[in-house]
Amino acid sequence: MAEKKVRVGVFGIGRGRMFAQQAAAMDGVELVAICDQREKAMRDFAAQYAGVTTYTEYDRFLEHDMDAVVLANYATEHAPAAIQAMRAGKHVQSENIAVKTMAEAVALVRAVEATGKIYMY
């Protein structure tokens, strides 16, 4: 039986470009979606990968059938984006510092506990 691949999406194609390239090249991982507000840059990048769906809206991106999300968006937005992704049923990796306040840290920990999803930084 073939091993199920981990389906990954990347949010933020500037700094996330490297993560997307690595995901696409890894055995056992499938790059399935990317999200960025810079539509042309995102579509140009996605054209290199067959079957990758592009989104400009984070909410719609999270509706995509994927197991995990790599957050490569603005560092100040990682905690809210991570919490939203976990509530949408996705595991999360932040490529940068996750929180800017203790309140965000507490909210992030609570989201991990409530959802049972894996969060990596």
Model-flagged regions — what are they?
Residues 25, 47, 63, 110-113:
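Solvent-exposed polar/charged
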Residues 40, 52-111:
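Beta-loop-alpha module in the N-terminal Rossmann-like domain of NAD(P)-dependent dehydrogenases
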Residues 107-121:
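Rossmann-fold dehydrogenase core element
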Residues 1-49:
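N-terminal Rossmann-like dinucleotide-binding module
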Residues 27-28, 88, 113-117:
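Short helix-capping segments at alpha-helix termini
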Residues 36, 72-73, 121:
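Conserved residues at beta->alpha junctions
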